[in-house]
Amino acid sequence: MIKKPDKKTLRQGKHKRVRRKVAGTGERPRLCIFKSLHHIYAQIIDDEKGVTLVAASTLEEGLKGLESKTNIAAAQEVGANIAERAREKGIIEVVFDRNGYKYHGSVAALANAAREKGLVF
């Protein structure tokens, strides 16, 4: 009997398809997000060098007081933090890699918060 693939497998397949086309450069690095069951992570990556330039997550000391670390409010804080750190390093334009997740909820909140703080994508 054919089993229906689970959500994680489907997301990973989407991510592989997207990564064939989306790559970060030195001038326009890739803003990649990851959601675990308990936290949200974002990092800006230069794929040509294979280096993470800036990172932010809900594991940081400043976000310890949040009630939930996976909801929209937490995603907005992570988006604002990543944008501020990117601007400090001189990064203004990025390519948004949603990592196979739907552009909805915490993913959209993170992206909108980063845009409000000055990142262009």
UniProtKB/Swiss-Prot annotation:
Keywords: Ribonucleoprotein, Ribosomal protein, RNA-binding, rRNA-binding
Function: This is one of the proteins that bind and probably mediate the attachment of the 5S RNA into the large ribosomal subunit, where it forms part of the central protuberance.
Protein name per Swiss-Prot or TrEMBL: Large ribosomal subunit protein uL18
Annotated stretches, region: Disordered: 1-23
Domain of life assignment: Bacteria
Record's compositionally biased regions (Basic residues): 1-22
InterPro entries registered for this protein in UniProt: Ribosomal_uL18_bac-type, Ribosomal_uL18_bac/euk
Family to which this protein belongs: Belongs to the universal ribosomal protein uL18 family.
Database matches in Pfam families: Ribosomal_L18p
GO MF annotation terms: 5S rRNA binding; structural constituent of ribosome
Database matches in NCBIfam families: L18_bact
Biological process annotations from GO: translation
UniProt keyword annotation of RNA-binding present: yes
Subunit structure: Part of the 50S ribosomal subunit; part of the 5S rRNA/L5/L18/L25 subcomplex. Contacts the 5S and 23S rRNAs.
Organism in which the protein naturally occurs: Syntrophomonas wolfei subsp. wolfei (strain DSM 2245B / Goettingen)
A cellular component term, taken from the record's GO annotations: cytosolic large ribosomal subunit
The keyword Ion transport belongs to this UniProt entry's keyword annotation: no
